[in-house]
Amino acid sequence: MTDAVGSIDMPDAQDEAPDSKKSRKGGKRGKKGPLKRLALFYRQIVADVRKVVWPSRNQLTTYTTVVIIFVVIMIGLVTLIDYGFSHAAKYVFG
């Protein structure tokens, strides 16, 4: 194999292990009951929500104002483009 930048390392034939020596995927993780998996999922959600950095009230007001102004500008832009296309269509098709 060449070690060029961006090349993919492909396994050679002698690198592959026979099927009898491969370990099973899943292991003990697949043996948990549905309630334990649901509890684990819930604990992971709570842990992730605790990591969230919530904006302050001032930041939230600023972000909301910026989004509303941007949406109003985009509505105006689309309205102008639509108005232009409608007049162009009336001019072309009579």
From Swiss-Prot:
Keywords of this entry: Cell membrane, Membrane, Protein transport, Translocation, Transmembrane, Transmembrane helix, Transport
Segments crossing the lipid bilayer: 65-85
Its biological purpose: Essential subunit of the Sec protein translocation channel SecYEG. Clamps together the 2 halves of SecY. May contact the channel plug during translocation.
GO biological process, one term: protein transport by the Sec complex
Name of the encoding gene: secE
Localization per Swiss-Prot or TrEMBL: Cell membrane
Region listing for Disordered, in residue ranges: 1-32
Example of a GO cellular component annotation carried by this entry: plasma membrane
Coiled coil (UniProt feature): none
Listed Basic residues bias regions: 22-32
PROSITE patterns from the UniProt entry: SECE_SEC61G
Listed HAMAP family: SecE
Molecular function GO labels: protein transmembrane transporter activity
Subunit structure: Component of the Sec protein translocase complex. Heterotrimer consisting of SecY, SecE and SecG subunits. The heterotrimers can form oligomers, although 1 heterotrimer is thought to be able to translocate proteins. Interacts with the ribosome. Interacts with SecDF, and other proteins may be involved. Interacts with SecA.
Identification of the protein by name: Protein translocase subunit SecE
Membrane topology per record: Single-pass membrane protein
